[in-house]
A protein has these predicted regions:
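Sequence/structural signature of beta-propeller domains
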Residues: 1-181
Length: 181
């Protein structure tokens, strides 16, 4: 399983139950670094939908973290803190964070994630599509376009706010460890 090829101490950081499809969605904390990964490759968070009664995976989606070279406001985003499902709007709210503390440039964002239009990649043969074992080993600058050419799409996201920019206390790095509706 690709999940055994993750960074040490980087498991499923958050889970959210989707009351619309009755699946439990698990968000891996940090981008995985499978064999072939190079610095500068895509920062992908995997989202696994599991039947909570049987533990059987039902779907898997790819969530692309913003790259530090795309936007300075997203520099350092490397972790998912928590997730919650909003049944009224059919979206997930997740927190992104970096490891900074005590700095107004710290990134502690809350982001809305929508699976509408995202491709279920569970059991995808990446070797056939990308000539690689996993999409994480693909170059960041062309991954999204090349996958779209194969009709594979990432989750959609809307950045809602960054806690430090709202005046939140900056004394610790894990201020977005919990979300609730």
């Amino acid at each position: 399983s690709v999940y055994s090829d993750r960074r040490t101490n980087r498991g499923f950081e958050s889970m959210a139950f989707n009351t619309d499809d009755n699946l439990l969605y698990a968000f891996i904390q940090s981008p995985m670094r499978p064999e072939g990964y190079l610095d500068g490759n895509a920062e992908i968070i995997r989202v696994l939908a599991v039947d909570p009664y049987t533990g059987t995976p039902q779907a898997e989606y790819l969530h692309l973290l913003p790259s530090a070279d795309i936007s300075a406001k997203n520099a350092g985003v490397d972790k998912v803190g928590d997730a919650v499902y909003d049944p009224h709007r059919g979206v997930f709210l997740i927190s992104w964070r970096d490891s900074s503390d005590g700095d107004t440039t710290a990134t502690k964002r809350v982001v809305e994630v929508d699976l509408l239009g995202a491709t279920n990649v569970l059991d995808t043969d990446w070797q056939t599509i990308l000539c690689l074992t996993q999409p994480e080993a693909y170059a960041t600058d062309s991954l999204v376009d090349d996958m779209a050419a194969e009709d594979i799409y990432f989750t959609n996201r809307v950045e809602l706010f960054n806690l430090p920019s709202l005046g939140a206390h900056l004394g610790f790095d894990k201020m977005t460890e919990g979300l609730a509706l």
